Amino acid sequence: MVRKIAIYGKGGIGKSTTQQNTAAAMSYFHGKNVMIHGCDPKADSTRLILGGKMQTTMMDTLRELGEVACTPDKVIETGFGGIKCVESGGPEPGVGCAGRGVITAITLMERHGVYEKDLDFVFFDVLGDVVCGGFAMPVRDGKAEEIYIVASGEMMALYAANNICKGMVKYARQSGVRLGGIICNSRNVDGEKELLEEFCERIGTQMIHFVPRDNIVQKAEFNKKSVIEFDPECNQSQEYRELARKIIENKDFVIPEPMTMDEMEELVVKYGVMD
């Protein structure tokens, strides 16, 4: 049965990069059939899997061809490792609601039964730290059963992670969605690992993996590839391989207990964290 995973995190934290490298590792190292559904108006959730190509989004296709003609063969592309890729896209700048686009795109994919076709994992890569109605849809309506939050040892990344947990709690009991853990995408700040471990303990989850900072990630992006495609034997590829394995084998799913603002302030002061 396909496992549906939503990846959340503060804008600029490296969420899409982490998600694409994890998906690539699942396919390349673990032989899984994977699909990525980008839920960000920037439509950059699949770029590294498709060799740097910005694919035509579902919303663009809907505007151009109409709903009847917006079929899976028009909007799904296959990239590295046989990974299926689709981007929701969004409205024209300054017009309409991008969250509404996410709802429309996911509903349309479900109607065509796309998420059930020979897949092991579907990743929903969701816009930044916005937990408004549309972007909360993977959580609210049970479209995703598992959530992983990408964070770092920086103050705003932790605040965003805590806010996402608050949004989760609101919908967890009705939708059945659960938090699978925090992925630390390291920024090399002092005491980062210890801070993230304490944060995870306080909200009742696990730090599923600590991804070290490595310039090969940027080098691979410059070459329009995931790290796994660029150099599958390098240390960073092995980190993503391990993260993928931990997600595949994960059984530790919880409804988090978000911290209060006062508790968050105490935590960042304790570790001397500044952005």
UniProtKB/Swiss-Prot annotation:
Top-rank taxon of the source lineage equals Archaea
Where along this sequence does the record place binding of [4Fe-4S] cluster?
C97, C132
Q: What class of enzyme is it?
A: oxidoreductase
Q: Identify the EC number(s).
A: 1.18.6.1
Q: What does it catalyze?
A: N2 + 8 reduced [2Fe-2S]-[ferredoxin] + 16 ATP + 16 H2O = H2 + 8 oxidized [2Fe-2S]-[ferredoxin] + 2 NH4(+) + 16 ADP + 16 phosphate + 6 H(+)
Binding of ATP occurs at: G9, K10, G11, G12, I13, G14, K15, S16
Q: How is the cofactor bound?
A: Binds 1 [4Fe-4S] cluster per dimer.
The record ties this protein, via PROSITE patterns, to: NIFH_FRXC_1 (PS00746), NIFH_FRXC_2 (PS00692), NIFH_FRXC_3 (PS51026)
**Alphabetically, which GO biological process terms does the record hold?**
nitrogen fixation
Cofactor annotation: [4Fe-4S] cluster
What modifications follow translation?
A: The reversible ADP-ribosylation of Arg-100 inactivates the nitrogenase reductase and regulates nitrogenase activity.
Which parts of the sequence carry ADP-ribosylarginine? Answer: R100
- Family that this chain belongs to: Belongs to the NifH/BchL/ChlL family.
What interactions and quaternary structure are annotated? Homodimer.
Query: Known HAMAP family for this protein?
Result: NifH
Q: What is this protein called?
A: Nitrogenase iron protein 1
